[in-house]
Amino acid sequence: MSPLALVSVSDKKNIIPFCKELVEHFNYKILSSGGTAKHLIEAKIPVIKVADFTNSPEILGGRVKTLHPKIHGGILAIRTDEEHKKDIEANNLELIDLVVVNLYPFKKTVDGGAKWEDAIENIDIGGPSMIRSAAKNHKDVSVLVDSSQYQSFLEESKKGELKDSYKAKLALEAFQHTADYDTAISNWIRKERDLQSSKYIESYPLIKTLRYGENPHQKAFWYGLSNIGWNSAEQLQGKDLSYNNLLDLESALSTVLEFGYTEKDELATDMVASVILKHNNPCGASMSNSASKAFLNALECDSVSAFGGIVAFNSNVDSETAIHLKDIFLECVVAPSFDEEALEILKVKKNLRILKISKDQLPQKNQNSTKSIMGGLLVQDTDDSEEKTENWISVTNKNPSNQINLDLNFAWKICKHVKSNAIVIAKDQKTIGIGAGQMNRVGAAKIALKAAGRLCSDAVLASDGFFPFADTVEIANEYGIKAIIQPGGSLRDQESIDMCNSKGISMVFTQKRHFLH
């Protein structure tokens, strides 16, 4: 008896050559319905229509096609079970040996901004049911949910009877496919109706097995979406991305995005930004009127730490910038675009990873941030809400000048991306000292101020958290700091304010904290 394949696919990629191979080389009969049946018939592939197979028409506008005992009985029947054999004979069931199903494009529909009613109609019911039935009975039935599986199935079939391990692998992929589908639906409903879910469920396909994790003895895997973020970035040259590369690229790009992002010359004057990052902390950042100046200014902050670092730009990288980039050892450079001349110059650095990621490939704001803890997961909103300077308060007798305000704004944006406790010293739209990841705030201030040294005169200081004491103001004054920006909110705020007033320092409270752990 010829084997029977049930074929119902939304994505029809390679389905015609696959079904032709099934029919011509393996003597399969094809059972299908709706658009898939029409597609196969037009390609001269013989098809048994589901309605004829079940003797039941499609009803409810196509909502019910394959939800029938003859379909699911033919899939779920255990071939060696005597009771099942009796049911098969009593109900005149024909056994289905292969299920080839992929689902209505729900993600694509909702990503395109579909109305609620249209999205609901794109929730597949029959497809997941057939997939799950076949996956449950994978010992007797093979299930394919993606066109990438077709060729391997044909190759395995040519070897003879399919191995149990191969069919179990197909079942795993099938259940993951339906789990991913249900996750997309539940998350869409949660977001559309602004509901708090009692369960946190996300689904990401495996992008790549990484060489190792944070350290060589740790295994690591990269999961993600194929059409957004780093997986959609174009790597123009260089070695494969490592686990640490990806972490640092994420931090570098997140920082530079504070200042706009475009591959075209659409940025306002002096809004071209460059950030150099090492071990998940900025070690230099600058805004200028060109990418080359921004990079060189950022490099001046800490050229020692920049060695082996990551560089991010918020605008096009030209040949002048590339000349400076090739003079230092770097792991990665990321930007929205690169001139051909720039890429030619950077070719000499064969191991340098160059990534191009456009504005359209960036994820939307207001996503979730997650961290693993023992026995669970912490979930929070990402700290990417727009900074509203109208909420800032000048709390000292002396108000900052317009130029000082520009530097305060710049320093505050960089400080947000430095590990807590964080202090950033800036002057003329560039960092001149950064104190990161210290257990006390005054310790971070000492590191940043010492790094900046004599350049601190008329510079500004940003702190990601409030001052518990006036000691940070006191040491800042010793170095010549002229303005301070911090969240405020300490019980001893007045002591810091009084210290600023006595030293002629202006201070601004943002009323928003930016801890980063």
Curated annotation (Swiss-Prot):
Disulfide bonds: none annotated. The keyword Plastid does not apply. Its EC number is 2.1.2.3, 3.5.4.10. It catalyses: (6R)-10-formyltetrahydrofolate + 5-amino-1-(5-phospho-beta-D-ribosyl)imidazole-4-carboxamide = 5-formamido-1-(5-phospho-D-ribosyl)imidazole-4-carboxamide + (6S)-5,6,7,8-tetrahydrofolate; IMP + H2O = 5-formamido-1-(5-phospho-D-ribosyl)imidazole-4-carboxamide. GO terms for cellular component: cytosol. InterPro entries: AICAR_Tfase_dup_dom_sf, Cytidine_deaminase-like, MGS-like_dom, MGS-like_dom_sf, PurH-like. Gene3D superfamilies: 3.40.140.20, Methylglyoxal synthase-like domain. It comes from the Bacteria. Pfam families: AICARFT_IMPCHas (PF01808), MGS (PF02142). Residues 1-145 form the MGS-like domain. Belongs to the PurH family. HAMAP family: PurH (MF_00139). The IMP cyclohydrolase activity resides in the N-terminal region. This is Bifunctional purine biosynthesis protein PurH. It comes from Prochlorococcus marinus (strain AS9601).
